[in-house]
Every structure is written in C-alpha cells, then in structure tokens.
Amino acid sequence: MSFLNVVLPLGSSVLSFVFAALVLDQWWQRRQSFQLVWAIGLVCYGLSTGAEFLGGTLGWSSSIYRVWYLFGAFLVPAYLGAGTLYLLKKTRFGYFVAASIALGGLFSLAATAKYPGSTGGGYTALAVALVAAAAIATATALRREHQAHVAMAFLVAGTLVVAGLVLTAHLTGRYLDSATHVPVAAAFPGYLRVSSVPFNAGGGLALVFGALYSAYIYMPKKRVVPARMGALAIIPNFFASLPGAVTALIQGKLNSRVPATILIAVGALVPGVTSSLNRFGVTWSFFLGEFLGLVLIFVGFLVSEDVFRNVRLGTTLWSRAPSASLESEVG
C-alpha cells in the first residue's frame, strides 16, 4: 500500500467536505441555485475520494468500488458543471452545454469499439444525450432562464438510472492497477463505461469553459471580432484580451475574479486530464490530479466574490464589500 495512495485521497476528501460546508453556508445566506448544486458536486467529490481512502486502508470491497465509480465517474463532473450553468443562466451558455453533451454522446458511441458488448449502451447514451442536448438548446433559445432547470431535470433522472445500474452491475476483473494500486473501472461492464462519457464531457467542459467565460467577462477586452458575432467572437477576443489582462494584473488593476476563475478552470482541467489518462492505463497521476485540481478550485473560489462574500464558522470571520455580481454583469 503506497503512503500517497492513502494520504492524497484523504486530503481530497476532507477538503471536499470542508469546501462543501462553506458553499452550503453561502447558499444559506444568499440562496443562489448554483451554490447548492456546486455543494452537491463537492459532496460527491468527497464521497468518491473518501471511497479511495477507505479502499486504500481497509481494502477494496465491491461496495467501496461501486461508490467510487458512481460518484467519481458520473456525478462529480456533472453536478459541478450543472452548477456552472446555473451561474450563467442569464447567458446563452446553454448552447455550449448542449453541444458538449451531444459530443459526449458521440464519444460514447465511438468508445464501444474498445468495449465488446457495449454497442447497445453506446447507442442508448447517444440517443439520451441528443435528446437532452436538444431540450437544453431549445430552452436556451426560448426561455433562457429555464436552461439550467432543464439540464438539472435530465441530470437528476440520469443520476437515478446510473445509480441503479452501478449498484447492481455484475463485476468481473480487477479493481486496481497492478503496478500503482490505483482504482480502475475495468471490473464494470462496457455498457456502463461508455455511458459515463456524456456526464464527464457535459459537466467537465461546462465547468472549465464556464470559468474561462467568466474570466473573459471581467477582463479588460480587446475586440478583434465584433461582439455582434456572438459566441464566435468570444474565443478570439478572449485570447486577444489576455495581454491586456496580464498588464492589468501587474499594475494591480485587474478584477480579482479574473485570476480566480482561471484558477477554477485550471483546477477543473487537471483531474479531468488525469482521469482521462486513467482510462488509458496511465494511473500514476490519478490521486495527485484529484488533490491538486481541488486545491486550485478551492483557492479560486475563495477569492471569487460570486461564491464567497464572507467566510463564517458560526460567526463571520472575514468579509468584503459587495460589488457587481457575475449574474448582473451577464444579465
């Protein structure tokens, strides 16, 4: 048993639950939907990494293994991404989320080539992903304020379905990588492994690019593409604006939300990359990626007023004066 295989998951789990408690406290004060959904995602993070800690110390039972896979592979990225969509519910970000979910469905179908007997699961995942994507895109076009609710309805239904599938699936094969003793999904049937892709793609991409979009909103902008081009203008204008943002940072004039949201984006990307590598047999970085990613997100959220206006442990320990919220900036 590797020392780091116990310490890193324990650190990730403890930090996740502390983080979730702080976000829940903020939700109690402000009653913003994105905070509640993010807190759910962080609890899922804590349960998944807690299962890794228990598996590393007590041994991997089928129950611990199922908890790890359900929360880690399906629910963590999905709920954190859904929280981001709630934060950006006054924008047209639902189009991006819809495209990400549809792309995840296509990747599910493509992944069936790697897992024999998973073709039915791949086609089912693709069909459900396309229906969800169409519903979210339609809500974004017709009633923008409902886009996050539509996505959440599909996510809750999907959570119930995959929970039943994961908890009852027949397990065959190894739970751990033989060299690094890191958990791998090899014991689960192929149809479940391909079904996790839309949850990961939709949620993970929403969290990463939602944070980058939030950074773009607050940074000093250089528009090389007219704003009337809509979403097509965001990417080139974002990169064109980066030098000005760096200059403003050096001069101490940059809105603190810009580095905060970039930290969140990088923090979301790190475990996404290491989890993807885990799927392809590169397992040594898995626990480290989970921990470092969570630390970066935590630091980013701490300096982001959109989440933390004050920090309390029974009483207010630290606070700052309110300024324009992200929702008001994009509304």
Residue ranges and their predicted role:
Residues 29-42, 92-101, 148-156, 254-263:
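Membrane-interfacial loop-to-transmembrane alpha-helix junctions, especially the N-terminal start
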Residues 207-218, 241, 245, 249-331:
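C-terminal transmembrane-bundle signature of multipass membrane proteins
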Residues 18-23, 79-86, 132-146, 200-227, ...:
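Alpha-helical transmembrane segments in multipass membrane proteins, preferentially the mid-helix core
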Residues 2-6, 26-29, 33, 60-67, ...:
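Juxtamembrane loop-transmembrane helix junctions in multi-pass integral membrane proteins
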Residues 2-16, 32-134, 287-295:
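Individual alpha-helical transmembrane segments in multi-pass integral membrane proteins
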Residues 142-160, 192, 212-266:
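Membrane-helix boundary/juxtamembrane motif in polytopic membrane proteins
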Residues 4-12, 115-133, 137-216:
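Extracellular-loop-to-transmembrane junctions of the mid-late helices
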Residues 46-58, 108-121, 163-187, 268-280:
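C-terminal ends of transmembrane alpha-helices
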